[in-house]
Amino acid sequence: MAAYNAPVSNCQFRLTHILPIPQRQGAPTDPFQMNAIRQQSDSAEPLRHDIRLLGRCLGEVIQACEGKRVYDTIETLRRTAVRFRRAGDPADDKLLQARVKQLRGNDPNSVARAFSYFLHLSNIAEDRDQNRRQRDRALAGAGPERGSLRQAIESLKAQGVNNARIRRLLSEACVMPVLTAHPTEVQRKSTLDVHREISSLLVQRERELTADELSELDLALIGQVATLWQTRMLRYTRLTVADEIENALSYYRSTFLNVIPRVYGDLARLLNREPVKPFTPPPPPLEPFLRMGSWIGGDRDGNPNVDAATLERALLRQATVLFEHYLQEVHALGAELSASTLLIEADPALLALADAGGDDSPHRRDEPYRRALIGIYARLAATARHLTGQELARRATVPAAPYDTPDALAADLAVIAASLSAHHGAPIARLRLSGLQQAVTVFGFHLATVDLRQSSDVHERVLAELFARAGDGIDGQAVDYLALDEAARVAVLRRELAHARPLASPWIAYSEETASELAVLRAAAAGRARYGRQAVLQSIVSHTETLSDLLEVLVLQKEAGLIAPPGETIAPGDGLMVVPLFETIPDLQRGPEIMAAWLDLPEVRQRVRLAQGDTQEVMLGYSDSNKDGGFLTSNWSLYQAERALVDVFSARSVRLRMFHGRGGSVGRGGGSSYDAILAQPPGTVAGQLRLTEQGEVIQSKYKDAEVGRWHLELLVAATLESSLAPQAAATSAEDAHMQQHAPAMSFMSELAQRTYRGLVYDTPGFADYFFAATPISEIAGLNIGSRPASRKKGQHIEDLRAIPWGFSWAQCRLMLTGWYGMGSAIEAYLETGAQGAPRSRRARLAQLREMASDWPAFRTLLSNMEMVLAKSDLAIAAGYAQLVPRRGLRERVFGAITAEHGRTLAMLRLLTRRELLADNPGLMASLRERFAYIDPLNYLQIELIKRHRAAQRRAGDDADIRVPRAIHLTINGIAAGLRNSG
């Protein structure tokens, strides 16, 4: 196949030479950027080779499976798209669109699959190349890479931070990525499994191979690509919560269970004062600071499919996967630890553990480690039976009592480790035992902490019903909860918390909503009792607007038996931490005031001190604040809220833990996690960090074990650097930035919000434009998540969830959520200034340039916006605008978008004094190549949406089911090409 057998320059995405920048009619002459933290390689040849190889495999598979005619059709489109992106001739662009419009029958599906899978395969190759370059860098003896643990530790030590301070921070730290099931993950688990196999084969090909071995691997590679081609890319039914649980658990098997202990091991070695010697005893496991969290099975906000049963299932399936791993590791240890007492001594404690193991085989009489591990295996199997109700052991076991706690398992493993270390077995312990010991401290018996989340208005309705059905209140008066003002609600809730009598009755039949909420909380209590308190720790309150929104959750916990009754001692870990989620711009502005009132309540302060270790978590929502106020206002409001929260918590001597509700797209807080953490206001990290990993970001970061290891390392390194770098200087510099630049930011934020809301909320007919000019309706039918795309039926922007909102703008290549309003804001500040601003335009420009170069918060903001603008394409977006039937509406809205896009580009160039990505020419060339494979998918999507909607208007439904399926295929491919669109 010429397309996929072509010379490497025809199919690779990341080139070392620079290609001419294509020019579109009506579009800026700018390159495009992908989201990644990557150093430029000295040689792109290995990547070129891998993409050429995978392209050749795909071409061979397509020709064999679909025939030469389809193959030639795909190749013609590919050549036309590449030629346009390289030469920039508008005639090629028109020819590409014309050829796409001619596709009929099943050809649109074949074309969509071909380009989509080529982008999937290129992503696999790029991920593999990242691993390769990091390894090559280490082999070359280069300095530590920015973002690595080694670089972080060396940097801190150079600033006078010693190991003791680092260890002290780690002993109290919390770094927790939280996997969520938001509907932007468009890949099936079946295809992800094949991706992993292809990546593994690429790794194997890097070894020195004989001709026969190489031929065998290449045949296997074609086999996997053929499997990919013959595997259905789309789901025919909507994902259930159970499906989402299993999808998430696949990343534990492939990545987290093995990689997280390795990250701990890497850090322990870096903190070791002396070089590790083979027979030096390995250090004991580090205190657990890096753990995993999950919303899957516990996030009820707007998802009627999540209830007590899904929470129970999530906890059960997590424990099942974990015990399968433990049993597998202990079984493997039994094979490894074959030391004989005829040859080497063993500790008395180890001998006692072996004797207690129940193995009386004469063949292992002199092998105490194996006998001890047989007993541990039996106890683990018994524990799994007790907790999961399943027989997970893959071998016969002796009768044994289950472990009561993970600490008991850890103690037995410590006995083995101590005996090995004392008798020349330290290098043996490092093979597997040390990693298992660390895993037990991290994962316990629960694997990951499942958060509960529900909207505050649901809590209000539940409490209102409980009060109404209870009759007279504590003071003898009936409580009409919904009719009370805020002060009265707070008073009623505090009285209820102080009273021991239950509010709910087991003899009353409550509404489905109330019964469900109480059942979830009771399931959480049961899960904590079964799997340990770490199984469920937080109850997040979406749409927190008032103090009563938080108190309501405490009252409901009292009803479910989660917190100690009034008058009883509050033990550490008692109950669930109530976590406010501030999402909209007004909520972010009120957040610090609400938290001050919360922490000033004596009963709450006591709970924070005794149950929560003087730690209180606050979650900030990036998605809804962006949808509410636009890119700049969202970011500035978040930044101000964080600074104000630091002051509130510092004044009350409470540790603040920020939980960042970030997504993949920049409009939802995406971008470099490392840079984002370092750009946080001083004092907001302090060893405490939770952040969501959502949608396609999960597979992008964690599908591959080595890539996953790097991303986890970035999170830990950034947390260490942000927390331990000298704070006085950082705080002083930040205060200076705020004093000098906050008025400018506030002025621009207000103007940007006015511009954004003027378009989205104040333009008549904008909702009609959005639903016509984006594939939002088609995305809703993609079966990519269990949660509905809208909170309510109908076409209202206010009811649309922030995630499909941003995903839709990415599909049509506008990425509006990541830049709209910025151009007008910067231009207005330059022209008129704010109160206290420099008097001249030149001086104001100098100020903004200083902010862009010296202030991390503003620099990161502009960097993320540049990434989004680089991926935008107004010429393609114009094609989507043509889907809007009302010409006047189309011209009014798209005209405003086009004008603001040009204005924003001009302002960014003015501030940075360069073209987009001019400081990264290698990436510029790479993106031109990649977009040559996304363009045909966009044009095909536009054409298919036209056909689909026309058929719906004619017949009320689409007679040809292939059309909507092909649309869904293009959505999949575009998302794969953009990589961070959700």
Curated annotation (Swiss-Prot):
Gene3D superfamilies: Phosphoenolpyruvate/pyruvate domain (1.20.1440.90). GO terms for molecular function: magnesium ion binding; phosphoenolpyruvate carboxylase activity. The keyword Lyase applies. The keyword Magnesium applies. Its EC number is 4.1.1.31. The active site is at H182, K627. Keywords: Carbon dioxide fixation, Lyase, Magnesium. Pfam families: PEPcase (PF00311). One of its GO terms (biological process) is oxaloacetate metabolic process. It catalyses: oxaloacetate + phosphate = phosphoenolpyruvate + hydrogencarbonate. Belongs to the PEPCase type 1 family. This is Phosphoenolpyruvate carboxylase. It comes from Bordetella bronchiseptica (strain ATCC BAA-588 / NCTC 13252 / RB50). The gene is ppc.
